[in-house]
Amino acid sequence: MICLGIESTAHTFGCGIIDSKGKTYANVTDAYKTEHGGIHPSEAKKHHENAKDKVVEDALKNANLKLEDIGLISFSQGPGLAPCLLVGLKKATELSKKINVPLIILLPDYNIYELIEHC
């Protein structure tokens, strides 16, 4: 089974695609950068909203896969910045509904390979 995962906990919006055997098909990221200081949550959210579609498209393209090839969607629940996490949740939910596949939450100590092996 092939899993598409979304990471959006803070300054980076990322999309990774893996299978249950441990093969990585793609890992595409786009990072929010500030000129001064740390992360501004509302600005990071805007960045993620602007980057999300291209990041997912690029990951699928790099993996030479179509969205319909995906059997499971996952996303990071946290810890992280709530505005950023919500962008990832919404994108993951949108994709899951579009192709009618399960949506799972990833927590920091989950082993995704074990999870998709049992789906």
Annotated model-derived regions:
Residues M1-C119:
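Short acidic/glycine-rich loops and adjacent helix/strand connectors
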